[in-house]
């Protein structure tokens, strides 16, 4: 036979019920995080070690590599270094190599 409490229930009965609920639930350590049935798991808070790494990387600009093309230059397009500069540089290298060979022969 159960005794039902009338509407104005004394506080000691409420606290006894709450104590029973608290005692019957598992502790947070026992619950743990396990993967869901569909195999997907999630993390509510980010891993602190990943956050430190992210903070270091977010201040850097991304590196952009532009590969030169081997085609005709469209009108108005600027190239660096200019072709004249490359030709002069190649001629200087050839003259330096010739001078080195002449010095070795002597």
Curated annotation (Swiss-Prot):
InterPro entries xref list: LBH, LBH_dom, LBH_dom_prot
Regions of compositional bias (Acidic residues) in chain numbering: 86-96
Main location: nucleus
Keyword field: Cytoplasm, Nucleus, Transcription, Transcription regulation
Cellular localisation: Nucleus; Cytoplasm
Statement: the UniProt record of this protein carries the keyword Nucleus: yes
Biased composition (Basic and acidic residues): 97-106
LBH domain ranges (all copies): 18-105
GO biological process, one term: positive regulation of DNA-templated transcription
Superkingdom to which the source organism belongs: Eukaryota
Regions annotated as coiled coil: none
Positions of the UniProt region annotated as Disordered: 69-106
GO CC, one annotated term: cytoplasm
Pfam family, one: Lbh
Family per similarity comment: Belongs to the LBH family.
Main function: Transcriptional activator.
Record's protein name: Protein LBH
Originating species: Gallus gallus
């Amino acid at each position: 036979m159960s005794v039902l409490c009338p509407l104005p229930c004394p506080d000691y009965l409420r606290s006894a019920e709450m104590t029973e609920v608290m005692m019957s639930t598992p502790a947070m350590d026992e619950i743990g995080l396990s993967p869901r049935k569909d195999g997907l798991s999630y993390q509510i808070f980010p891993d602190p070690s990943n956050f430190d790494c992210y903070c270091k990387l977010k201040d850097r600009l991304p590196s952009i590599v532009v590969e030169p093309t081997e085609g005709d230059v469209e009108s108005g397009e600027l190239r660096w270094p200019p072709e004249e500069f490359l030709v002069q540089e190649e001629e200087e290298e050839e003259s330096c190599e010739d001078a080195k060979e002449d010095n070795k022969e002597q």
